[in-house]
Each structure stands twice: as C-alpha cells, then as structure tokens.
Amino acid sequence: MGAFTGKTVLILGGSRGIGAAIVRRFVTDGANVRFTYAGSKDAAKRLAQETGATAVFTDSADRDAVIDVVRKSGALDILVVNAGIGVFGEALELNADDIDRLFKINIHAPYHASVEAARQMPEGGRILIIGSVNGDRMPVAGMAAYAASKSALQGMARGLARDFGPRGITINVVQPGPIDTDANPANGPMRDMLHSLMAIKRHGQPEEVAGMVAWLAGPEASFVTGAMHTIDGAFGA
C-alpha cells in the first residue's frame, strides 16, 4: 500500500521534466493521477501509457479551461501546479502579448486553479505550486518578467494560506534551482555559469523535486503552509 493510495491528484503541466517526475512519483505511491499537457501531446501520451495516469489537454493560458479541468477532477486531495513558461530578453524589446501570456500561465493559472481546488477539497487537502529560485535571485539580465511571475507566487501562497487554513488546506511553493530537464539540460551552455554560483555544483534531478513535493503533500507536512521551499544546491544562498 503506497503513501498516497486512495488519494486523487491533479498535476497541471505533467507531461515532461519536473511535471513528469511528479506524475511518476504519485503513481508509484498509489495515487489516482490526472495531469494536463498543452504542447507535448506525444510525451503526454507516452507518460499516460507508462504510468496509467490520465492525460488531459489544457491550455493554462485559458482561465476557463484551467477552472474547468480542476472542477471536473472532483474532490481533489492534492493539486500540483507545475505548468509554466519563460519569456526571456531585454525588457525594452519584449512583445507585450508574450508578457501577458507569461503572466496568464505563471500567475493567473496557479491562482484560479488553487481557488477552484479549495472549493471542493476535503479537509487535509494539499496545494503545491512549482515556482523558481529566480523568484528570490536573478543573477543575469533578460529575465525580469519571468522573475516577476515567480515572485508573485510567493505573495499568492502566503495570502491563500490564510484563506485556506480554516478549511484545513495547506498551500506551499517549491522553488527549484537548476534542474536537469530539456529546458535547462545539465550539459547545456549555461552549466558552468550556473554551477559557479552553487555550493553543490551540479544540476538537480526532477526526481529530487518530486520527492520534496511528495513530502509536502504527505501527513508529516500538515503544519507547513504559506512557505517557500527552495531546492537549488545553494544557488540562492
């Protein structure tokens, strides 16, 4: 019997990288898992076949679609919001429409998903939002909008923790540093610069982030809410 046997889990953004590792972790631990995808249909199909989880197409930039997928998931025990994008470049040169889409996916979707989930969660429900260490530290130029979107999650989680606490629901933010995914590979061009800023000079693995998520979703973290949990090899220290 797994740690999450009988639990219902929805993961927004679960087809690749950190999201896929979280899907695998909860399935391995016995949960009934649904996950969303947008641009990675083939990866989502493979993951669903591998794990038995259910894949659901959802554009996280569409507020109504986000609310709908949460609502149709029923009385969730655990919500994980991992969907996110990056828009990078000098602020004076970026397209305003791209920035609006970034904020819709990285800020609006986590907010609306969390609120809708809390409406139907039982006492003891868990909400985990995947943020970024860049919400605390931005050592390079060209990432202001991305950093702003991740910093916003901190205030959101602290405020929603106050609103959800009387319902017995916790909400926390997991803030990864450099993690070995296709978006930021361990052998990529940024490796040496990133590792020079870290005490543990390697990229983290998606499974390490999934492990932190699983702990925060479990019974030992029932008194933990409104907090930021950084997993970054001291990138932000």
Curated annotation (Swiss-Prot):
Annotated positions binding NAD(+): 10-34
Q: Which organism is it from?
A: Escherichia coli (strain K12)
Keyword check for Cell membrane: no
CDD domains associated with the record = SDR_c
Protein name according to UniProt: Cyclic-di-GMP-binding biofilm dispersal mediator protein
* Residues given in the record as substrate binding sites: S132
State what induces this protein. Expression is time dependent in biofilms and is controlled by BdcR.
Report the function annotation for this chain: Increases biofilm dispersal. Acts by binding directly to the signaling molecule cyclic-di-GMP, which decreases the intracellular concentration of cyclic-di-GMP and leads to biofilm dispersal. Also controls other biofilm-related phenotypes such as cell motility, cell size, cell aggregation and production of extracellular DNA and extracellular polysaccharides (EPS). Does not act as a phosphodiesterase.
The question of whether Thylakoid is a record keyword is answered with no
Q: What are the alphabetically sorted keywords of the record?
A: c-di-GMP
Q: Which InterPro entries match?
A: NAD(P)-bd_dom_sf, Sc_DH/Rdtase_CS, SDR_fam
Gene3D superfamilies xrefs: NAD(P)-binding Rossmann-like Domain
Name any Gene Ontology BP term: single-species biofilm formation
Question: What does altering E50 to Q/V do?
Answer: Shows higher affinity for cyclic-di-GMP, increases swimming motility and biofilm dispersal. Biofilm formation is almost completely removed
Which GO MF terms does the UniProt record name? Answer: cyclic-di-GMP binding; NADPH binding; oxidoreductase activity; protein homodimerization activity
Indicate the family of this protein. Answer: Belongs to the short-chain dehydrogenases/reductases (SDR) family.
- The entry's active site is Y146
Name the Pfam families on file.
adh_short_C2
Q: What does gene deletion cause?
A: Mutant shows decreased biofilm dispersal. Deletion increases the cyclic-di GMP concentration in the cell.
